[in-house]
Regions:
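Bacterial N-terminal signal peptides that target proteins for export
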Residues: 1-7
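Sec-dependent N-terminal signal peptides
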Residues: 9-12
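Feature captures C-terminal
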Residues: 21-37, 86, 92-94, 100-105, ...
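Hard-cation-handling environments
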Residues: 31-115
């Protein structure tokens, strides 16, 4: 009888040990790059094409309309680029619809998610550039906070700023540092107040620009039509109606010495 109990005890212990959770340990990582391009269009799965056709028609009807044209390829990069100049300028342009007259605009590089390419600009292109729900936002900063903001922009190696902003940044092993800042050719008055237009995401102090969260008289329109992509779309539509092609250039708004 003792041997029988011993056998059953051993069997139960073996069963429990086999059911215990296994602990895995990573021993290595391998990766490869799979390029998704037109090669996959050469032999499409006909059943999949038929299944997707009605959804594709709806998607194309939304994404394909042309809202304007750009004069050349535009790519976002620090410290300054044509595209990162265009977008804050669009915020300045849009401000009139809110009865606002901002002195300058800030648009974060991280919020620019794609390039624009020479020629027609569709809703798909605009959505690719500005896919987030970031909305236009207005705030008043003292000159002291403006300088703090420009110092934060300098430490990041540059962000999108509107025409009239002139920043000089130095670069060393310790990083980037603001050397000088001017607005529309004038020195920043630390006691003056400056109206700024930006995105609500930045006004909350994100992307290292905490100075924007320290201002006052904040106006944050919450209607979905105030999202940056719709403002960009409206800008292109306006230019297109006037027969104008959208253009932007690097102008020396942010210089690194």
């Amino acid at each position: 009888m003792f041997r029988l109990h011993l056998f059953y005890g051993f069997f139960v212990a073996l069963l429990l040990s086999s059911c215990a959770p296994k602990h895995y340990q990573l021993t290595g990582i391998e990766r490869t790059r799979i390029i998704i391009d037109s090669r996959y269009d050469q032999n499409p799965d006909e059943a999949a094409v038929r299944f997707m056709a009605p959804y594709k028609r709806v998607n194309d009807s939304i994404m394909a309309p042309v809202f304007g044209r750009v004069a050349h390829n535009m790519h976002p990069q620090r410290p300054e680029s044509d595209l990162s100049n265009l977008l804050p300028d669009i915020l300045i342009w849009a401000a009139k619809d809110y009865n606002e007259s901002p002195v300058f605009a800030v648009y974060n590089m991280g919020g620019i998610r794609s390039d624009l390419y020479k020629g027609d600009v569709t809703y798909e292109h605009i959505l690719s550039v500005a896919p987030f729900e970031n909305k236009i936002c207005f705030i008043t900063l003292t000159g002291e906070l403006v300088m703090k903001l420009f110092e934060q922009i300098a430490r990041r190696g540059g962000e999108g700023v509107s025409k009239g902003v002139e920043l000089v940044i130095s670069k060393s092993d310790a990083g980037y540092r603001l050397v000088s800042a001017r607005l529309h050719g004038q020195e920043i008055d630390p006691t003056a107040e400056y109206r700024v237009v930006t995105l609500d995401y930045l006004q909350e102090g994100n992307d290292g620009m905490t100075a924007l969260s320290e201002g006052k008289d904040v106006v944050k329109p919450q209607d979905p039509n105030n999202c940056s992509r719709f403002l960009i779309m409206n800008y292109f539509q306006d230019k297109h109606a006037r027969g104008e092609i959208v253009d932007a250039q690097v102008e020396g708004r942010i210089k690194i010495q």
